[in-house]
């Protein structure tokens, strides 16, 4: 069973809320407490980013969080530890978000087996070439990990067809060109792309990049989108000096965004 797609399927009259946080930012204890809080406040899926020094798809907020996490010693092994601590205590499935090079360095099969053993349910690799997905899909399927593939707003119809055909489950639709980060508005072209994906496939769609407010979500819910990813807005909330302030801030944000996802 594709747990991530099933989580999206379970919201026929609403839109799944998918917070993203960077593992180890600003420290591992905060990450663990944040995961518990997001779970308790209604997050439907959680993306947990593995810090990386060359995160080309990420904007300044998430790049900064990765730098701090790396300086604090958070690498793959520490992320596996976080998963081991929290996964059996959460109702919310976790998607791991690394870049491709660290996976290759560790070994694709070893990496997938490790994240599966520690409780992850999904994998998103922002810089994974479509031409190199076949091996990863097989290994993920063998280990009950759902690989989520990207569709960019610049993707041709032919490429969207190929991605939709290859995708084992849901698709991550990027809302705009460029990097992650808070934006004032979401391009209506997203609606055209989501409608096209639904026309040529039965895949569920999560939308990310630039989504940060309840108003964004209410607009997006009319566009054939099954889930919304909110990253930079959550990561910013974790920059407070006191851990209690960090957790209360992401709790409030999660509540307000969750409320917006319900029709």
Curated annotation (Swiss-Prot):
Plastid is among the record's keywords: yes
Any one GO cellular component localisation term in the record: chloroplast
Molecular function per GO: tryptophan synthase activity
Annotated EC: 4.2.1.20
Pathway assignment: Amino-acid biosynthesis; L-tryptophan biosynthesis; L-tryptophan from chorismate: step 5/5
Keyword Nucleotide-binding: no
First-level EC class: lyase
InterPro entries, sorted: Aldolase_TIM (IPR013785), RibuloseP-bd_barrel (IPR011060), Trp_synthase_alpha_AS (IPR018204), Trp_synthase_suA (IPR002028)
Keywords for the protein's UniProt record, in alphabetical order: Amino-acid biosynthesis, Aromatic amino acid biosynthesis, Chloroplast, Lyase, Plastid, Tryptophan biosynthesis
Localization, UniProt: Plastid, Chloroplast
Function noted in UniProt: The alpha subunit is responsible for the aldol cleavage of indoleglycerol phosphate to indole and glyceraldehyde 3-phosphate.
Entries under NCBIfam families matching the protein: trpA (TIGR00262)
Similarity field: Belongs to the TrpA family.
Subunit structure: Tetramer of two alpha and two beta chains.
Protein name: Tryptophan synthase alpha chain
Taxonomic classification: Eukaryota, Rhodophyta, Florideophyceae, Rhodymeniophycidae, Ceramiales
């Amino acid at each position: 069973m594709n747990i991530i797609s099933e989580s999206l399927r379970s919201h026929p009259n609403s839109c799944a809320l998918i917070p993203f946080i960077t593992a180890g930012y600003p420290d591992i204890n905060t990450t663990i407490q944040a995961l518990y809080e997001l779970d308790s406040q209604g997050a439907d899926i959680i993306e947990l980013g593995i810090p990386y020094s060359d995160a080309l798809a990420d904007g300044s907020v998430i790049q900064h969080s990765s730098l701090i996490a790396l300086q604090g010693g958070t690498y793959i092994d520490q992320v596996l530890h976080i998963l081991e601590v929290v996964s059996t205590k959460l109702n919310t499935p976790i998607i791991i978000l690394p870049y491709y090079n660290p996976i290759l360095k560790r070994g694709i099969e070893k990496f997938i087996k490790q994240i599966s053993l520690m409780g992850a349910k999904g994998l998103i690799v922002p810089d994974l070439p479509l031409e190199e997905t076949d091996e990863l899909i097989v290994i993920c399927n063998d280990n009950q990990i759902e690989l989520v593939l990207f569709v960019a707003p610049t993707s041709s119809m032919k490429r969207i067809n190929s991605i939709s055909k290859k995708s084992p489950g849901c698709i991550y639709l990027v809302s705009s060109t460029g990097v992650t980060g808070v934006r004032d508005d979401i391009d209506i072209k997203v609606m055209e792309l989501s409608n096209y994906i639904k026309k040529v496939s039965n895949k569920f769609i999560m939308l990310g990049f630039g989504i940060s407010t309840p108003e964004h979500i209410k607009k997006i819910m009319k566009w054939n989108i099954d889930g919304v990813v909110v990253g930079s807005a959550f990561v910013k909330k974790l920059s407070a000096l006191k851990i209690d302030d960090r957790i209360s801030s992401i709790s409030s944000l999660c509540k307000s965004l969750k409320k917006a996802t319900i029709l």
